C-alpha cells in the first residue's frame, strides 16, 4: 500500500513532464513569430529609408522641362549656318533637350509661296522685311499677335575662292569687274532672294549690272546658299554672298571684301510667328534676346535692338 502511494506521489510530482514538449514547441513558435515580425519591421524600415533616399535624390536631381509641341520653322537660306547653333542654345537655355525643332531652308520668296499655299510652318524667318509684311497683310490682317519682328541685319560680301580680294574698295572692285570681261559673277535670284536683290542694287549703283547682264557674266543662283556654293567651288570667279557664310568657313582676308552697309539697301531680316504654338513664340522671343543676338553677331550679322 505504501509503495502504491509512493508511486502515486511520484507520478503527481511530474505532471508537466508529459506536456513540456508542447510548451517547448509553443516557445519555438512564439520565438519564430517574433523573428518574423522583426524581419518585416526591419524590411519596412529599410524600404522606407530607401524610398526616402530615392525621393531625396529625385528632388535634388536637375529638373528637365518636358518638351512642348514640335516647332516647324521656314528659314531663309542665309541662316543655314547660324540657326542650328541658335536652336541648340535655345534648348540648353530653356532646359528643353528633347524639344523637336524642324527647319526648312530656302529662298524667302519660295518659303512665302509655300506658306500662302498652306504649308504647316509655325515660324517664318525671312531674309527681308517685305515678305513677312505681305504675309501679315494677306493672311493675318487685323491680328495684332501676328506682327512681323526684326531679328537681325545681314551683311553683303564679295567672295572668291580663286581670286585675291584683299585691300579692295568700292572703286577698285568696280574697276576689277570692268577690266576682266571673262570673269563670272554669281548673285542669288533678286526676284526671290533679298541678298540677291541687294546685290543687284549694288551693281546698279556702280553702273555694272546692265553691262554684266549683256555680257552674260552674271550667273543667277536660286538662293544665297547656292550662290555661295558656286563661288566656293570655283564654278564662278566671284560671288555676292552673305557675310555670315564667309564667317562660317573662316575665310582668309584675301578671299572676301565686305561691302559698306550704306552701299546697298539694308538687309533687315524680319520674322513672324504664324501659329498659336506657345513654344514658337518663345523661340521668336529668344532670337531677339541678348543671348540670341550674341549668336548673330558672332556669325557675321549686325545686331538689332
Show where each model-derived region lies.
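A common structural microfeature
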Residues: 120-121, 155
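Intrinsically disordered, glycine/charged-rich N-terminal periplasmic/extracytoplasmic linker segments
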Residues: 113-118, 125-133, 142-145
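A short beta-strand-loop structural module common to alpha/beta enzyme folds
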Residues: 98-108
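Exported/periplasmic ABC-transporter solute-binding proteins
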Residues: 45-91, 95-96, 109, 116, ...
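Short, low-complexity disordered leader/linker segments with a strong preference
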Residues: 1-70, 300, 304-305
Amino acid at each position: 500500500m505504501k509503495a502504491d502511494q509512493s508511486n502515486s506521489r511520484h507520478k503527481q510530482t511530474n505532471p508537466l513532464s508529459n506536456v513540456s514538449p508542447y510548451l517547448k514547441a509553443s516557445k519555438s513558435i512564439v520565438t519564430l513569430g517574433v523573428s518574423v515580425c522583426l524581419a518585416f519591421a526591419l524590411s519596412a524600415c529599410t524600404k522606407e529609408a530607401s524610398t526616402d533616399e530615392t525621393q531625396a535624390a529625385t528632388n535634388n536631381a536637375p529638373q528637365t522641362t518636358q518638351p512642348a509641341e514640335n516647332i516647324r520653322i521656314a528659314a531663309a537660306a542665309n541662316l543655314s549656318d547660324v540657326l542650328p547653333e541658335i536652336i541648340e542654345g535655345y534648348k540648353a537655355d530653356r532646359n528643353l533637350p528633347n524639344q523637336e525643332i524642324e527647319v526648312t531652308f530656302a529662298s524667302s520668296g519660295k518659303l512665302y509661296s509655300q506658306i500662302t499655299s498652306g504649308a504647316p510652318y509655325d515660324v517664318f524667318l525671312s531674309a527681308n522685311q517685305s515678305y513677312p509684311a505681305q504675309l501679315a497683310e494677306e493672311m493675318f490682317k487685323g491680328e495684332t499677335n501676328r506682327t512681323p519682328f526684326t531679328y537681325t541685319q545681314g551683311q553683303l560680301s564679295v567672295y572668291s575662292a580663286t581670286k585675291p580680294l584683299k585691300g579692295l574698295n568700292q572703286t577698285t572692285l568696280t574697276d576689277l569687274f570692268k577690266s576682266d570681261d571673262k570673269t563670272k559673277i554669281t548673285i542669288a535670284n533678286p526676284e526671290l532672294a533679298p541678298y540677291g536683290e541687294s546685290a543687284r542694287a549694288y551693281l546698279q549703283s556702280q553702273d555694272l549690272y546692265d553691262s554684266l547682264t549683256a555680257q552674260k557674266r552674271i550667273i543667277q543662283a536660286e538662293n544665297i546658299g547656292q550662290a555661295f556654293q558656286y563661288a566656293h567651288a570655283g564654278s564662278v570667279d566671284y560671288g555676292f554672298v552673305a557675310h555670315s557664310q564667309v564667317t562660317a568657313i573662316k575665310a582668309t582676308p584675301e578671299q572676301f571684301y565686305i561691302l559698306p552697309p550704306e552701299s546697298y539697301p539694308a538687309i533687315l531680316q524680319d520674322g513672324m510667328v504664324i501659329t498659336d504654338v506657345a513654344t514658337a513664340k518663345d523661340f521668336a522671343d529668344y532670337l531677339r534676346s541678348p543671348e540670341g543676338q550674341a549668336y548673330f553677331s558672332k556669325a557675321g550679322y549686325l545686331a538689332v535692338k
